Amino acid sequence: RSRQRLLSAEGETQARTVGQVFQRHRLGVDEVLASPFARCHDFAQIAFGRVQDDRQLLGLLSQDSGRQQRIDHSLALLRRAVVAERNRVVVGHSSNIQQTTGVFLPEGGAVLVRPDTKAERGFSVLGELRPADWAALAQAA
């Protein structure tokens, strides 16, 4: 932890806002998975009150021997069905998101996907949320 970039005060505020959006809109959450990096783990913990660290969600910036395995794991998560009326939350790194979905997000953003066996990749991208979108959703009734 001491050598990692920690979640900033702005990141903590964003995490609380994300949690408020899920509560206010009664969005059910099944799993909360996160990269074990401190900022990812802490974001998930603050937003959802629980988190399961998943080493396979480490970033993809290096060309190490486990890179393809991490890509495959992320793709499997996106393809795997969730419990009805529930969501799987994955807090990770932009490199993973870009590699698996083709979407580039700023920190604090989200890509919404749905498993879809008819889609070429086995999932469909439904949309994106930018950091400012979370604040607007938190205010909406």
Residue ranges and their predicted role:
Residues I71-A84, W134-A141:
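A polyampholytic, Gly/Pro-enriched intrinsically disordered region
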Residues V18-V21, S74-L78, Q98:
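A generic local structural motif
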Residues L33-A34, R86-G92, N96:
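Beta-strand elements within well-structured catalytic alpha/beta cores of enzymes
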Residues R80-R86, P115-A119:
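A short, structured loop/turn motif at beta-sheet edges
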Residues L57-R67, I71-R79:
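All-alpha RGS (Regulator of G-protein Signaling) helical domain and cognate RGS-like helical scaffolds
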Residues S94-Q98, D116-T117:
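Short, flexible beta-strand-to-coil junctions
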Residues R1-R55, L60-D64, V103-A132, L137-A141:
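Active-site-proximal alpha-helix that buttresses catalytic centers in soluble enzyme cores
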